[in-house]
Amino acid sequence: IKKLSRKEKSLIVEIHSSLMGYKLGSSICCSGICLTVTSKNKNTFKADISYETMNKTNAKYWKVGKKINLEKSLKVGDEISGHFVFGHIDTTCSVEELYKVGSSWFLSFKFPKNLKKFIVQKGSISLNGISLTINEVKSNKCHCMIIPHTYKYTDIHTYKKNEILNLEVDMLARYAHSSNS
C-alpha cells in the first residue's frame, strides 16, 4: 500500500501493482475485497473503500507499506483455479495458529458461529482472497493446510496469531443453503 487518504467515513487507497491489463473501472481483488480502479498510473492504482466495506473488512487496519494480495477478475474463458471468489467479504476472522508441518503449513482460524452452516470439511473458503480447502471444522474454528507455493506467493507468510483476515464463504455453499431453507 503506497498511500491511504481518509475521506469522511470512507478511505481512498493507492496501491503499488505489477498487474497488467486493467483499466479504469476494472475490479481488482485486494486482500479478498472487490475494489474498483478509480485512477491509475504506470505502477499504481487508486480505489475507494466505502464505509460499509471498512466496517466488514480488515481494510480499517491497513497501513502504508502493508503488502496485500492482488488479483484481477476472471474473464469468460479464463481458467478457474480454486473456487469462485467474488470479493464480497462476509466478515473478518482471527488467526489462531500458523506452523510448519513437513513442507506445508497448518493454519487455523476462528469465525463467527452464524457462518458455520456455510463452512464444511473439504469445502472452500476465501481468506484475504486466497481460495483454500477446509480440512477440519470444530465449533467456530477450522483449519486449512497451506502448500509451499501458496505460502510463498501470498501474504500468508506474514500472518501472526490474532491477525484479522477477510473471510468470504463459498458462494455455492451459500446458494445451496438458501435453496434448502
What annotation goes with each model-predicted range?
Residues 1-181:
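Conserved loop->alpha-helix
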